[in-house]
Amino acid sequence: MKTVLSLMAAALVVAAAIAAQAPAAVQQAPAPDAWRNFEGSLSASGQRQTLPTESGRPAATVQLSGPVAITAGEGLSRAFRSEAIGFDDGAGLTVLRGVWTDDRGDRIFTRLNGETVASGRRIAATITGGTGRYAGITGEYSFEWQYVVEAEAGAISGRAIGLRGRYHIEGTRK
């Protein structure tokens, strides 16, 4: 019995020594073209011009700009300047085109679709391309307008919450 316990103790010591010498698991970075998730927030202000329609809901053009803050994820700048222009036909079709520009001048281009720009409305976007380090980027994101405030003379401003998306960049660019 004493021999069995000695052998078991020796086996445990050997196993512990082997485990201590084993290389630690290396956490690999995602492949350059792997899908990567991101989260953030955005605020925007600009102008909205409206035109009456037969439905009673006005058609509108909108031009917005403001900061985008990326709060989670990797591979993107943490801050962008966002610009968007778009059209709401007054009958439920809203289409916008946007561009995010980082501090180096590299850009991400987007196409946005959704409901009228108003509080509580959701917007879905497709990332359609980029320049510089974002060349070859594609993906998608969405957000909800937490609030949209309209002031006199067509001025509009708002804050979006729940900005979440994913992207990948073709090839070896990061």
Spell out what each predicted region is.
Residues 8-17:
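Bacterial N-terminal signal peptides
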Residues 22-174:
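Beta-strand-enriched cores of mature, soluble protein domains
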